């Protein structure tokens, strides 16, 4: 207020002093403001029922950023105001043909138009530049501003999303019965066309690296029922329909996330003996949790929708959790033994016969085993027969013949025929039999014990191998279920984002595109 009084005082002194330093512009300012007793607090109308028409346009010089977490759009704009003030008219010929006059905004009436949906409490422009006045009273005011407007974020298809942000301007102290807010017009071939779009100067505009502008319409809105008293409520809204450029998120989020997700399939190929099946799956799960945390830090805390990448991470984390559960089951079956568990016939039929054939698991049949394994089994199975034959042979042969049978044949001696036990004197047969049994009984018992242990060991190993095969079958079955689901789910989720396109027209149901290429006459 002190500056205004100083300006008035300076003008008055210059005018009334009569000094030669007074030029025509100073005289004009004095006539308009002092002599005519200009009151900047009064609307520029001749009658109280008249309405002041304010024309607005917006020039965008830079789309600075869109902070999703704060839901704030920061833009650098030039806000153009235009109106007529009959009190600021003059005859240019009387003032050395002055065609334009520049005045501080503190000296004249200006419409108190503010950004309604601001997000930082700054309603007005950042810099109050001079107003331009023409002899016919046409006043223009083009202040620059950096607006931080509220922009509701739709996170449903993040990072393949598009947003509809707006800058809504309204009069702070006047209603629609006192001033009207309209879009500025442009004259082309003698016709007036309203500027129903945000003006962008290609030479002065700085393109944003993350967002691409699709539509930039402007529209006047009237709300006659906004207030109970019927006072019309109006605003002029400039819309920015922008689409995200997803390259940053594809390179830094999606690609590493997908690659790490498919590392969970390695858990199916690792043998249970390695001890790394469970740790591999858990490492993948922790990596996905980190990606989910990073994503949540870039999005607003909203319960209206789940972002696309969030859906993918939750989907993958569910599958990886299934892999971890599968690893636990497989390890449980792998380390089972006959001493702790019994393998039922039903389990053998399902996991050792039916499922391996369906899953194309290679398991050699007994008929396809190598010859040395068949010979070993044949020798093991016929050990008892050999022992019984040896016992019969020892009953027939005497000890001397057994010891010197080959030597006697080389020296031409004829082997003595030993009578069968059971012929001759019974007492002699019994004595001979007892003598033979006493000498070889311990050897036969030892051999039978060895055979028994071998059979038990073979049966034990076979049972353990069957439990291992059951675990491998479950592992293979889970791999054939989880891996295709992971691949198809990944494709389906990200294909959804590919079909999320901005609308062809700015407003649904309105065929007009609100662009400078297709203006419509007022």
From Swiss-Prot:
Sites bearing Phosphotyrosine, chain numbering: 393
Spans traversing the lipid bilayer: 246-270, 278-295, 312-333, 477-497
GO terms of molecular function: acetylcholine-gated monoatomic cation-selective channel activity; transmembrane signaling receptor activity
Keyword Nucleotidyltransferase in record: no
Membrane topology: Multi-pass membrane protein
UniProt keyword annotations, A-Z: Cell membrane, Disulfide bond, Glycoprotein, Ion channel, Ion transport, Ligand-gated ion channel, Membrane, Phosphoprotein, Postsynaptic cell membrane, Receptor, Signal, Synapse, Transmembrane, Transmembrane helix, Transport
Catalyzed reactions: K(+)(in) = K(+)(out); Na(+)(in) = Na(+)(out)
Cellular component GO terms, alphabetical: postsynaptic membrane
Superkingdom of source: Eukaryota
Signal peptide feature range: 1-21
Disulphide bridges: 151-165
Membrane topology, Extracellular segments: 22-245
Record-linked InterPro entries: Neur_chan_lig-bd (IPR006202), Neur_chan_lig-bd_sf (IPR036734), Neur_channel (IPR006201), Neuro-gated_channel_TM_sf (IPR036719), Neuro_actylchol_rec (IPR038050), Neurotrans-gated_channel_TM (IPR006029), Neurotransmitter_ion_chnl_CS (IPR018000), Nicotinic_acetylcholine_rcpt (IPR002394)
Localisation: Postsynaptic cell membrane; Cell membrane
Cytoplasmic compartment segments: 334-476
KW Ribosomal protein (keyword) present: no
Residue positions the entry lists as glycosylated: 91, 164, 229
SUPFAM superfamilies named among the record's database cross-references: Neurotransmitter-gated ion-channel transmembrane pore, Nicotinic receptor ligand binding domain-like
Family assignment from sequence similarity: Belongs to the ligand-gated ion channel (TC 1.A.9) family. Acetylcholine receptor (TC 1.A.9.1) subfamily.
Complex formation: Pentamer of two alpha chains, and one each of the beta, delta, and gamma chains.
Role of this protein: After binding acetylcholine, the AChR responds by an extensive change in conformation that affects all subunits and leads to opening of an ion-conducting channel across the plasma membrane.
The protein, known as: Acetylcholine receptor subunit delta
């Amino acid at each position: 207020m002190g500056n205004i009084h100083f300006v008035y005082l300076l003008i008055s002194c210059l005018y009334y002093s009569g000094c030669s330093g007074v030029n025509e512009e100073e005289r004009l300012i004095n006539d308009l403001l002092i002599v005519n007793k200009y009151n900047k607090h009064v609307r520029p109308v001749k009658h109280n029922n008249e309405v002041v028409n304010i024309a607005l346009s917006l020039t965008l010089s830079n789309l600075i950023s869109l902070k999703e977490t704060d839901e704030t759009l920061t833009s650098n704009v030039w806000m153009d105001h235009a109106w007529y003030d009959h009190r600021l008219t003059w005859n240019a010929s009387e003032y050395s043909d002055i065609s334009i006059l520049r005045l501080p905004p503190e000296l004249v009436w200006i419409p108190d138009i503010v950004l309604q949906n601001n997000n930082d409490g700054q309603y007005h422009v950042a810099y109050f530049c001079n107003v331009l006045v023409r002899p016919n009273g046409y006043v223009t005011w083009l202040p620059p501003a950096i607006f931080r407007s509220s922009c509701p974020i739709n996170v449903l298809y993040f990072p393949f999303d598009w947003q509809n942000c707006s800058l809504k301007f309204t009069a702070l102290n006047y209603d629609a019965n006192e001033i009207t807010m309209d879009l500025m017009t442009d004259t082309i071939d003698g016709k007036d066309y309203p500027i129903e779009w945000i003006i962008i100067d290609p030479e002065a505009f700085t393109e944003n690296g993350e967002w691409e502008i699709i539509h930039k319409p402007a529209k006047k809105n009237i709300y006659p029922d906004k207030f109970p008293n019927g006072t019309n409520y109006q605003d002029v809204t400039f819309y920015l329909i922008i689409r995200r450029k997803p390259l940053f998120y594809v390179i830094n989020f999606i690609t590493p996330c997908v690659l790490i997700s498919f590392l969970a399939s390695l858990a199916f190929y690792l043998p249970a003996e390695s001890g790394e099946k469970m740790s591999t799956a858990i490492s993948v799960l922790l990596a996905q949790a980190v990606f989910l945390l990073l994503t949540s830090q870039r999005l607003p805390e909203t319960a209206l929708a789940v972002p696309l990448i969030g859906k993918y991470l939750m989907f993958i984390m569910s599958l990886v959790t299934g892999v971890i559960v599968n690893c636990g089951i497989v390890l449980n079956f792998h380390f089972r033994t006959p001493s702790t568990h019994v393998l039922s016939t039903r389990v053998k039929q399902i996991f050792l016969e039916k499922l391996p054939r369906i899953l194309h698991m290679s398991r050699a049949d007994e008929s396809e085993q190598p010859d040395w394994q068949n010979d070993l089994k044949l020798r093991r199975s016929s050990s008892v027969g050999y022992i019984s034959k040896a016992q019969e042979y020892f009953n027939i042969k005497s000890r001397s013949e057994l010891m010197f049978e080959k030597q006697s044949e080389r020296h031409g001696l004829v082997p003595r025929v030993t009578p069968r036990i059971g012929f001759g004197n019974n007492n002699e047969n019994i004595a001979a039999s007892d003598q033979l049994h006493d000498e070889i009984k311990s050897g036969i018992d030892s051999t039978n014990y060895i055979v028994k242990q071998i059979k038990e060991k073979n049966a034990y190993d076979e049972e353990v191998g069957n439990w291992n095969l059951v675990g491998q079958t479950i592992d293979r079955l889970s791999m054939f279920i989880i891996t295709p689901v992971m691949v198809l789910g990944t494709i389906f989720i990200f294909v959804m984002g590919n079909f999320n396109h901005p609308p062809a027209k700015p407003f649904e149901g309105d065929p007009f595109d609100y662009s400078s290429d297709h203006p419509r006459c007022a």
